[in-house]
């Protein structure tokens, strides 16, 4: 659970707004907003029926953004994601018909149920910020955010994302089942209708884009950068790790921390930000040795072990 600290007035409203729909998932709402602020993307892994789709819809509605959904299936084609060129007999020219990737907030539902080729079409668009169809390049919407969902790998009919593709996601999150009381609240909220239907924007899309630009003005001093690098480099030296976190992971953790600091109405990063975010930012970028997997060792546990061994820089601390 995140440490207790006041949120940015505007962004705090969005968090509470999402929490009206997603009972008991405040931390997931905060992390999703942080990823969107950092211009990153989120991979949400969990069993069906825990509210992954509602989370993305609530996020989109809270900032007045255009929401698109892609339901990934084994027969989905790359053009079903990126769009196609259609011949117009009247103009005798080909016209681009946009795919769902052209939305602001895109739900890539069950991404591990489609072929690697179609997965790549989405992931390359996420990386480049554009799509190319028949030689023509189209820029993606601004803001642009993908929340991809996947079922756990033990489910049948899945195509696991390779490590190089997982690296494209800022965070990998799990929602989990609600508690007894939370599930009671869900039933009460949906007794007559779903609260998502009456959700209104609390931040204008243009204001959110401005806040995204403000993230780069959040300071991460040298001690914070050294702290990040030391943690990341130790993932490459750990005996259970076959492939450690790349420099892209270091950058991702710093950007995530800057966004998280802004969300908490600060213009500087503190060690608490790194400690809280590292378990969501680093483990999915690591490949463990087969014997470590066989022994049940988890990448997240390795990250926590490393953080417990790395000296924390002395800085201003958040109020807990």
UniProtKB/Swiss-Prot annotation:
Provenance organism: Bacillus subtilis (strain 168)
Sites where the protein binds ATP: 46-53
Recorded GO MF terms: ATP binding; ATP hydrolysis activity
Lineage: Bacteria, Bacillati, Bacillota, Bacilli, Bacillales
Pfam families in UniProt: AAA_3, AAA_lid_2
Keyword hit for Iron: no
Domain of life: Bacteria
Keywords: ATP-binding, Nucleotide-binding
KW Transmembrane (keyword) present: no
PANTHER family, sorted: METHANOL DEHYDROGENASE REGULATOR (PTHR42759:SF5), MOXR FAMILY PROTEIN (PTHR42759)
Similarity comment: Belongs to the MoxR family.
Protein name per the record: Uncharacterized protein YeaC
